[in-house]
Amino acid sequence: MNSLSTEQLGIGYGDRVIVEDLNISIPKGKITTLIGPNGCGKSTILKTMSRIMRSHAGAVYLNGKAIHKMSTKDIAKDMAILPQTPEAPSGLTVHELVSYGRFPHQSGFGRLNDEDRRIIKWALEETGMAEYAERPIEALSGGQRQRVWIAMALAQGTELLLLDEPTTYLDLAHQLEILQLLDRLNKEQGRTILMVIHDLNHAARFSHYMIALKKGTVIKEGTALEVMTPDILKQVFQIDAEIVTDPRTNKPVCLTYDLIKNEKELVTV
């Protein structure tokens, strides 16, 4: 069962075509990761699937409904999006930012009710940010800020979370902190998660499903073991990679790789 899908989706900037005839389905209740080289269309696809960008052809379907026919508020009730390097208004506290997640559910003057407060408290606790509720966003570390943004997304009460490079600019410990949080949200609450990640080993470790892209085209999709193979990485990234399976996770790990400079060495998969 799929909660988010595209049908013959076409995306572009002016006369430049980025993606054409894209057909993908995001498995419900799973973590799916888009991988591919810079400029392959990963973030563009994510933005279009969340209606931040408009498509020039085809459609995106959210729970069976075409999103271009849905109101922004209705979309926000079903799907939360965390863009790359989001910026909070100056002087905002953690609690204030997380409370913005309740906006799609409010009416009238937009005042928080008891249910809103309960959900905000829960989101802060789930992300380990309750003790920082009254702290200014500017006073937080990079990893803490990302957790606050995820808390805001949780406060929306959506089943579907879209994240564009949620570990960008974070050190290794903070990267794992964020990915383990997303993994827990998926396992304990059944959240459907679609994200863009550059680190292949992180993508493989934390994903149920991977979609490898090159120049706006799907090269391979499937489990990490099916997608992260030497042949696929050679075609997508132009690298000669050594892949082993981690016995603890049964997931593929890229041990080392070299750049392929001779196009004759590339294979068509």
Curated annotation (Swiss-Prot):
It is an enzyme of class 7 (translocase). Its EC number is 7.2.2.16. It is found in: Cell membrane. It is a peripheral membrane protein. One of its GO terms (cellular component) is plasma membrane. Residues 4-240 form the ABC transporter domain. CDD domains: ABC_Iron-Siderophores_B12_Hemin (cd03214). Keywords: ATP-binding, Cell membrane, Ion transport, Iron, Iron transport, Membrane, Nucleotide-binding, Translocase, Transport. InterPro entries: AAA+_ATPase, ABC_transporter-like_ATP-bd, ABC_transporter-like_CS, P-loop_NTPase, Siderophore_ABC-ATPase. This is Iron(3+)-hydroxamate import ATP-binding protein FhuC. It comes from Bacillus subtilis (strain 168).
